[in-house]
């Protein structure tokens, strides 16, 4: 059973764990992070809000020595410049910290595909050698032609070397539970069992 541990931002407030695995979820504001986390663990661990920019802290959820880390969304302009800079600084520091194993799941709204700000985050994550996997959310909103176009564009990013060959991608819908079983299986088999 997953449980909420704490909200943190500055380094002295981070959860300290030497021998644990942290799966981090990050994405643009309002990409559907909280809904995905709740669907993923099949329990309500994260508050779902229609208002973008709601998550402003690093939120930790724990089950034994496994952690889910919900990072504040990026690209939300309604916060003050100072608050955005502070959040960006501490998120960057958190992701660079190598005290425990971290794996990043970057959430992309399937309706927009990878945006300019997503590309910036991908470049940063690649530069710090963090394992990255992509989750295209809200896939139920796309028709078959749009899904095919999304997959084609994703493959172009793979070919362009922006994404590593080890980057996996998942098409999911938290609402309709599409793709969740594959995602859960991947996490259990390839991350938590290591």
From Swiss-Prot:
Keywords: Cell cycle, Cell division, GTP-binding, Magnesium, Metal-binding, Nucleotide-binding, Septation. GTP binds at residues 27-34, 53-57, 70-73, 137-140, 172-174. Its cofactor is Mg(2+). The keyword Nucleotide-binding applies. GO terms for molecular function: GTP binding; metal ion binding. One of its GO terms (biological process) is division septum assembly. Mg(2+) binds at residues 34, 55. GO terms for cellular component: cytosol. Pfam families: MMR_HSR1 (PF01926). CDD domains: YihA_EngB. Residues 19-193 form the EngB-type G domain. It comes from the Bacteria. Belongs to the TRAFAC class TrmE-Era-EngA-EngB-Septin-like GTPase superfamily. EngB GTPase family. Necessary for normal cell division and for the maintenance of normal septation. This is Probable GTP-binding protein EngB. It comes from Mycoplasmopsis agalactiae (strain NCTC 10123 / CIP 59.7 / PG2) (Mycoplasma agalactiae).
